[in-house]
Amino acid sequence: MAEITAKLVKELREKSGAGVMDAKKALVETDGDLDKAIELLREKGMAKAAKKADRVAAEGLTGVYVDGNVAAVIEVNAETDFVAKNDQFVTLVNETAKVIAEGRPSNNEEALALTMPSGETLEQAFVTATATIGEKISFRRFALVEKTDEQHFGAYQHNGGRIGVITVVEGGDDALAKQVSMHVAAMKPTVLSYTELDAQFVHDELAQLNHKIEQDNESRAMVNKPALPFLKYGSKAQLTDEVIAQAEEDIKAELAAEGKPEKIWDKIVPGKMDRFMLDNTKVDQEYTLLAQVYIMDDSKTVEAYLESVNAKAVAFVRFEVGEGIEKASNDFEAEVAATMAAALEK
């Protein structure tokens, strides 16, 4: 039987990522054949990964990588936040983001077939990681964003990598693009412009806003405060030319009723129209980047601020770890019972 030296164990660990005992056992089982030991560890890793396949992995990290005029944002999941801080896990995330940015796959199937620095496919690398780390490690999603030579990427990660953002800005510079990405990370817009909002979605969100106003008015009535008006509109998409023209006419009629001289209306109407637009685009302000108040200058929307510096936002992607994943709530008694049952089966 071949001698299993510490040097051989170390070499296998470096190539496979396996622990000391697993590496030594694999070498013993394969009579010191390094290649066979690697294959054996891979097979065992696939078996371990299969056992963990039905677990919920809702923690993890985002990865962001820029490759020239292409940027990738990815999400990789683990079962616990503790593992998400593991050096091996962090390296896997960073390598995956780089491989995807450079490989430019069109879907997850193509992404999983890409070759990692280890020589494994991306899919195999995640099986290996699941086996060596001891938790289900899964590649969840990615997005690729492209720009022209004249445009700028803003790459930003927040909260230790739990949020990853790429923004494309035309005009300005990389620093401005990064500031916009910081805004996106903080304010959670879902689309760039109101033109991307579904009409039914706007209708439903407006109903929710008015329901909240109704509840607020009940509280206000109890302390003899005047009721707040309900909102007629929620998005710029609903503000047709006719609606805007009627709003302006209503404002002028109000000024006339108040006895304001007509010669000063031109100074008053624009401000009141701005207020009308602000009050009737609440859904846009919640969900669209361009309509949100800019965190770097709260006197302007993102769109207005960028216009003031001869720039505009073209696109963005924002990933937050665990979005849309339902985390399992463990029943402690059931967990203990399952552990005991598993022990009895052995």
Swiss-Prot record:
Keyword check for Ubl conjugation: no
Family annotation (InterPro entries):
EF-Ts_dimer_sf, Transl_elong_EFTs/EF1B, Transl_elong_EFTs/EF1B_dimer, Transl_elong_Ts_CS, UBA-like_sf
Chief location bin: cytoplasm
List, alphabetically, the Gene3D superfamilies matched: 1.10.286.20, DNA helicase RuvA subunit, C-terminal domain, Elongation factor Ts, dimerisation domain
The entry's keywords: Cytoplasm, Elongation factor, Protein biosynthesis
What is one cellular component GO term in this UniProt entry?
cytoplasm
GO MF, one annotated term: translation elongation factor activity
Region feature (Involved in Mg(2+) ion dislocation from EF-Tu): 80-83
Q: Can you list the disulfide-bonded cysteine pairs?
A: none
> Any idea where this protein resides?
Cytoplasm
Specify the superkingdom: Bacteria
Asked if the Swiss-Prot or TrEMBL record annotates the protein with the keyword Metal-binding, the reply is no
Under PANTHER family, the record lists: ELONGATION FACTOR TS (PTHR11741), ELONGATION FACTOR TS, MITOCHONDRIAL (PTHR11741:SF0)
Q: Which HAMAP family match?
A: EF_Ts
Functional description taken from the UniProt entry: Associates with the EF-Tu.GDP complex and induces the exchange of GDP to GTP. It remains bound to the aminoacyl-tRNA.EF-Tu.GTP complex up to the GTP hydrolysis stage on the ribosome.
Q: What is this protein called?
A: Elongation factor Ts
**Source organism per UniProt:** Streptococcus agalactiae serotype V (strain ATCC BAA-611 / 2603 V/R)
Q: What is the lineage of its organism?
A: Bacteria, Bacillati, Bacillota, Bacilli, Lactobacillales
Q: Which gene encodes it?
A: tsf
